[in-house]
Amino acid sequence: MIYGTGIDIIECARIQKVMERDIGFRDKIFTEGEIAYCETKNRNKYQHYAARFSAKEALMKAIGTGWRFGIRFADIDIYHDELGQPHIRLTGKAKELADKEGFSKIHVSLSHVKV
């Protein structure tokens, strides 16, 4: 059963501008694993940060609660398996909500344009 569908899009340049202006934004929004992954992308890192930001926003739209209930962006971890397929791992309040609502499988697709 599909619990919900969420879609989000953001301009990569917007994420780049915010991150260059406020280093705390990165640490508040992204997990250590996401930061490590994106930082390996050198010239294209902001594209990868933007894709993860949008995936987190899309997930919250799919759940239908918005950012209430104390869920933090960093409670949502976007990672890749050994084949490069993206997945979502929930922790903290996001996991509590998922467990309460009874959804365990989350599908995600990431897209971005070159900056």
Task: Please report, for each region that a protein language model flagged, where it lies by residue.
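Core catalytic alpha/beta fold that binds nucleotide/phospho-ligands
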Residues: 1-115
